[in-house]
């Protein structure tokens, strides 16, 4: 039915031919073609009640949305605008962008942060104050977070955000309101998030049905047919976060580097104690204690089970202060720092004080030592992602930075009052090469809504639970024109994944998480393809054979059709002759996968999903006695 959707897109564009391409307030900005396109379609179809902006980081989702809000009154006089956002993002980018380009809509805007514990009450209180003659436009920024907070927990408890989700899914279309959801990563943790998002945008269209069988979509054609026009899809980088990507005129080159570091005997001893503690307390599935132990270890492992919280906190504070005091008035000599900046380690002729300090620091954290050496050897500015703030996280890392003489800012929950200003200073043109501030270390608080410019190296000290979060992290530094001020030879970003291993080189929890991420991504890639093929851009570019229409009366019927996956008509069992193979998507063999090559040259993954045809002259490497095809 994409031809039908194409006809409505064409109708919307014909209705909005005179819509200005510039947005003017206290400042003026000219929209990119893709921004102007999606705004014209959404505003040109008044009965298009909802839309997902699946736009990668840095291409201007916020700007596109503000333009749409500015022109809402082109289609109706009275609007109330409700923006559901994280608290950290209200001032910047939202309020700043509105005040700069559409100050006249400020009086119509209501900001509510969905991470507020009173979110539900605040939302419905504001709904009651809206004039009955006004239409409502709801904006949900980083909608994957809103969806995640609306999922029913495993214990069956309904979360407060769910009532807002239910209200929006029932009311937006019914009352002729509008809604825009924004995300660069619309699916993060589970397939259920896709179902929730679809039913928010197209209420009731995707009922309780299994989307996958043996990790393959049951009926991709049915989903694409019924969900046409669901989203706008602007994703220039469709590669895995673990793949290298060549640069372009607008985007920096990305190179992924896996840095494997072996723990010291002392660190491994604490790691094993952390593993036992997880088993005893029943939290081994979360791997938190082991993840912390791979990052940094004190001289002893503080047991938490069956202890008074205050007593435990006091022990942690004592261990931290002891370590901090051990570094008082100690730092590396200029000679040692010069050696590190050349990418070299201390030699035998180094001072005893430098060697002793380096040995002590490395015994407690091979990761922190490695990241400090990497920063000093970097030719430009650096980002460091460390999800833990206290105990063995950022608080300790900053002590390492001090000893290594690394200037830095911190973006975390500890710096709420100063972090926006600090990032602005870090991004200043005068700091393009990191002369004033070399590094920004950030926690999960910095994964969304902020931009960094002229970054050359990103160090990821701990794996997240999903590729989407990693994509958000890396996307902070590789954005549209993020390196425009950087010298041409430094328009690149090296992404370093620092993976701890046991002292004998055996894997740790870091590689467990790496495998979990790869497993999840198999299903997500297929759902992202559905988003792409149901997008306004894809339909407009690929569907040309349609009959023009002169009204939008049939749009609601077109997008209200229920999705039926019960027939499973695209699942067929077929025996294929061929041979088992090994393959990798990386020249550095970061991950090696089992696959199958049919006699016809088609290559499949271990679950039978078709990948691509075997090249005429494939690249092959030998690793551990295996022939590895590089695709």
Curated annotation (Swiss-Prot):
EC number: 3.6.1.15
BP-aspect Gene Ontology terms: DNA-templated transcription
Pfam families noted in UniProt: Helicase_C, NPHI_C, SNF2-rel_dom
Keyword Transcription: yes
Domain Helicase C-terminal residues, every copy: 367-532
Reaction equations catalysed: a ribonucleoside 5'-triphosphate + H2O = a ribonucleoside 5'-diphosphate + phosphate + H(+)
InterPro entries for the chain: Helicase_ATP-bd, Helicase_C-like, NPHI_C, P-loop_NTPase, SNF2_N
Record-annotated disulphide pairs: none
Molecular function GO labels: ATP binding; ribonucleoside triphosphate phosphatase activity
Swiss-Prot/TrEMBL keywords: ATP-binding, Hydrolase, Late protein, Nucleotide-binding, Transcription
Motif (DEXH box): 141-144
Function: Serves two roles in transcription; it acts in concert with viral termination factor/capping enzyme to catalyze release of UUUUUNU-containing nascent RNA from the elongation complex, and it acts by itself as a polymerase elongation factor to facilitate readthrough of intrinsic pause sites.
Stated family: Belongs to the helicase family. NPH I subfamily.
Name by which UniProt lists this protein: Nucleoside triphosphatase I
Organism: Vaccinia virus (strain Ankara)
Taxonomic lineage from the root: Viruses, Varidnaviria, Bamfordvirae, Nucleocytoviricota, Pokkesviricetes
């Amino acid at each position: 039915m994409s031809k039908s959707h194409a006809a409505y897109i064409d109708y919307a564009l014909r209705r909005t031919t005179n819509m200005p391409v510039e947005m003017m307030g206290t400042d003026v900005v000219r929209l990119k073609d893709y921004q102007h396109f999606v705004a014209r379609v959404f505003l040109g179809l008044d009965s298009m009640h909802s839309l997902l902006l699946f736009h990668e980081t840095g291409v201007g989702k916020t700007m596109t949305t503000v333009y749409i809000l500015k022109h809402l009154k082109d289609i109706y006089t009275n609007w109330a605008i409700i923006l559901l956002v994280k608290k950290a993002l209200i001032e910047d980018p939202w309020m700043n962008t509105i005040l700069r380009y559409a100050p006249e809509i400020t009086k119509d805007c209501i900001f509510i942060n969905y991470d507020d514990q009173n979110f539900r009450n605040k939302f419905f209180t504001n709904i009651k104050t809206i004039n009955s003659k006004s239409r409502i436009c709801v904006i949900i920024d980083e909608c994957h977070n809103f969806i995640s907070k609306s999922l029913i927990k495993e214990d069956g408890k309904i979360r407060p955000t769910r009532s807002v989700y239910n209200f929006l899914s029932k009311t937006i279309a019914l009352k002729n309101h509008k809604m825009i959801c924004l995300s660069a990563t619309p699916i993060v943790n589970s397939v259920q998030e896709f179902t929730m998002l679809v039913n928010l945008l197209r209420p009731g269209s995707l009922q309780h049905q299994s989307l996958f069988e043996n990790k393959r979509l049951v009926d991709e054609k049915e989903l694409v047919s019924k969900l046409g026009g669901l989203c706008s899809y602007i994703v220039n980088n469709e590669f895995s976060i673990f793949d290298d990507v060549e640069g372009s005129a607008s985007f920096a080159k990305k190179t992924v580097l896996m840095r494997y570091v072996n723990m010291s005997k002392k660190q491994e001893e604490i790691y094993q104690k952390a593993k036992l503690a997880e088993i005893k307390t029943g939290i081994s599935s979360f791997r938190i204690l082991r993840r912390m132990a791979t990052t940094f270890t004190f001289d002893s492992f503080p047991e938490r089970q069956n202890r008074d919280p205050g007593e435990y906190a006091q022990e942690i504070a004592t261990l931290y202060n002891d370590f901090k005091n051990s570094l008082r008035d100690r730092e590396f000599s200029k000679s040692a720092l010069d050696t590190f900046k050349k990418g070299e380690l201390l030699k035998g002729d180094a001072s005893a004080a430098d060697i002793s300090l380096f040995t002590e620091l490395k015994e407690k954290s091979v990761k922190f030592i490695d990241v400090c050496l990497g920063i000093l050897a970097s030719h430009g500015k650096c980002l460091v992602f460390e999800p833990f703030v206290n105990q063995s996280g950022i608080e300790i890392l900053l002590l390492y930075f001090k000893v290594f003489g690394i200037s830095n800012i911190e973006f975390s929950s500890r710096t709420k009052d100063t972090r926006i200003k600090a990032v602005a200073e870090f991004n200043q043109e005068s700091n393009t090469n990191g002369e004033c501030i070399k590094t920004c270390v950030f926690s999960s608080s910095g994964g969304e809504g902020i931009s960094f410019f002229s970054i050359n190296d990103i160090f990821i000290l701990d794996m997240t639970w999903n590729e989407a979060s990693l994509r958000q992290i890396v996307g902070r530094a590789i954005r549209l024109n993020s390196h425009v001020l950087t010298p041409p030879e430094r328009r690149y970003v090296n992404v370093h994944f620092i993976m701890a291993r046991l002292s004998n080189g055996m894997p740790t929890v870091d590689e467990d998480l790496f495998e979990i991420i790869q497993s999840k991504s198999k299903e997500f890639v297929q759902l992202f393809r559905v988003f792409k093929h149901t997008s306004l851009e894809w339909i407009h570019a690929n569907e040309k054979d349609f009959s023009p229409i002169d009204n939008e009366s049939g749009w609601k019927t077109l997008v209200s059709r229920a999705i039926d996956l019960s027939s499973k008509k695209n699942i067929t069992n077929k025996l294929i002759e061929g041979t088992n193979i090994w393959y990798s998507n990386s020249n550095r063999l970061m991950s090696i996968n089992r696959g199958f090559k049919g006699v016809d040259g088609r290559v499949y993954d271990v679950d039978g999903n078709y990948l691509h045809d075997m090249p005429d002259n494939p690249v092959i490497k030998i690793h551990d006695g295996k022939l590895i095809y590089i695709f």
